Each structure stands twice: as C-alpha cells, then as structure tokens.
Amino acid sequence: MTEQGMHQELREGAGTAGDEGGLEAAAMDGGADNGIDVVLVTGLSGAGRGTAAKVLEDLGWYVADNLPPELIAQMVDLGLAAGSRITQLAVVMDVRSRGFTGDLDWVRTELATRNIVPRVLFLEASDDILVRRYEQNRRSHPLQGNQTLAEGIAAERTMLAPVRASADLVIDTSSLSVHALRDSIERAFAGETVAHTNVTVESFGYKYGLPMDADTVMDVRFLPNPHWVDRLRPNTGQHHEVRDYVLGQPGALEFLDSYHQLLDVVIDGYRREGKRYMTVAIGCTGGKHRSVAMAEALAERLQDSDLTVRVLHRDLGRE
C-alpha cells in the first residue's frame, strides 16, 4: 500500500487494507482485548525488507509500507479500539522517510504512551552482496544520487548504525537464501509470546568470516579436527561418528557445561533488558565438523530451558 493511499484511508475512516478488505473492517470483530503487537521492519536497502514484510503478512500480520510516523500511531489506535482484530502490526520503514532516525524515536516514544513497546527487526547484508544485488536488478540505491553505488550503501549504513545498535533482532542476509530468510522470520515471529526468548545457535567456519549478527562468538578450534581422520572427513558434525569423536575429546564436555552455565547468566540478563533474541555463534575452521557438532549439542542443552531454540549451520555444504 502506498503512503498516500494509507493517508487517504485514515482520513476517511475506511478504505482498503491490501487485498483483504477495508481498514474499518480490519479494525472490527474478534480481536485481542489486551493490546497490539507492533514490529518496525527496517534495515539496509536491498537486504530483504520486502521479503520480511511478505513473510509477516503470510503469518497473519497486518503489514503497512513506509507510513509517516503519525499514521503509525493512528494505526495502533485502530488496533487498540474495542472489537479490533488488528492485533499484529508490522510497519516497513526506510531511509527515504525524512529524518528517519528521529521518526523512529518519535514512534517509540509515542507508542510508549500507549504502553506499547514496538520491536525493531533490522535486516542487513555485506557491502559486496548489496552491490551484487543492485547490479543484478539494475537499480540505483535510494541514497546514491550522484555518488557511486558503494558510497550510497556506505552512507545508509552510517545513517542506520544507531538503529541497528538498538534493534531487537538483527538478521544478516548475506549468506541466506530467500527460503532461509523466511525460515528465520517464521521461527522468530510465528506464535511467540511477548516474554519468550528466542536463541539461535549458529555454527560457522572462520575461513568464511564471522557471522555479522552474532551476539556472542565461541571458538572450538581447540578441539582436534575430524578433518584429519580419514573415515570422518566426508561426514559432518551431524553424523553420529563425528559427533561422538568431537564430544569425546578431553575438555569437550567440560566446555559445554561451562558455556551452558555462562549462557544461562547472559540470557537472564538479556531478558531483564527486554532483549528477546540472541544469536550464539560457534566456529571452527571450515564450519563442517567441530562447530556443527558442538552447536547441536549446545542447542540440546538449551532446549531444557524456557527458550525457543533453533540451530543454523551457516557454512555446512560450502566445502
């Protein structure tokens, strides 16, 4: 929906909500009585905001694109109205909005007066991936102007740095397919409760670089490498022989016990600070054996806690 169209609808008190009927209809019949869940979708241009919005829409969220801040507040008021069935609102915001960072702060402050704390989903990707995507689509960057594409991307990254720092969930789409991005968003937003904590345990290979979205990184290259065992080399850390080999090494189980205890403390602290998402990265040389086995084992231990845990093997299959 266009910004102008939404403005017209809110002024008239009706209108269409995408292809699903009018705003007036969307605000009636059988909604939640206790409030509305709000997610602000933002991030770097070309990083996948549109895909994220489509996934949220498929999950049943009411999605609006590039609304002025005051209309976001009005949409929330519709959701708070008695009988409203708008219980989940996702708004896509980008740097084409004038005074973007100030607008985002205003929205947060305004919604706080309604006892609503909006979550911020921030999507990003590496510079080389963004350049490749823009070149493939033959599009110009919204901040490019008379500059080069790389300069436009750099300007946007600098502008959005404060937003990224305060985001609830950061997803780096550099190495994600559309399917993998959809899976990440579905796991984060499908059927969650407000107080739930979502933990992603991600294995990776140092030879391919650090995960940009990791909250904490642990190196398990202190363990012997199954790559040098002929019978284990073709398999991955998901194979029981490789897993048994890795976990059977001196110090492996002690590491898991200690790291699990440390994460319990960290996760409790994040909960107190209102952070609902955490990515724990575990790395080895190639992301095939040790980090995969340790990530699987750690995720199993975390499942015993009151957490939603998923495992992501970023570099599995790259060798």
Curated annotation (Swiss-Prot):
Keyword Repressor recorded: no
Top-level lineage group: Bacteria
InterPro entries assigned: P-loop_NTPase (IPR027417), RapZ-like (IPR005337), RapZ-like_N (IPR053930), RapZ_C (IPR053931)
Signal peptide: none
Positions annotated to bind ATP: 43-50
Functional note: Displays ATPase and GTPase activities.
Annotated region described as Disordered, given as residue ranges: 1-26
Descriptive protein name: Nucleotide-binding protein Mvan_2698
Stretches with biased composition (Basic and acidic residues): 1-12
PANTHER family in the cross-refs: RNASE ADAPTER PROTEIN RAPZ (PTHR30448:SF0)
Any Pfam family matching the protein: RapZ-like_N
A GO term for molecular function: GTP binding
Keyword terms of this UniProt record: ATP-binding, GTP-binding, Nucleotide-binding
Family, similarity comment: Belongs to the RapZ-like family.
Binding site for GTP: 94-97
UniProt cross-references to Gene3D superfamilies, sorted A to Z: P-loop containing nucleotide triphosphate hydrolases
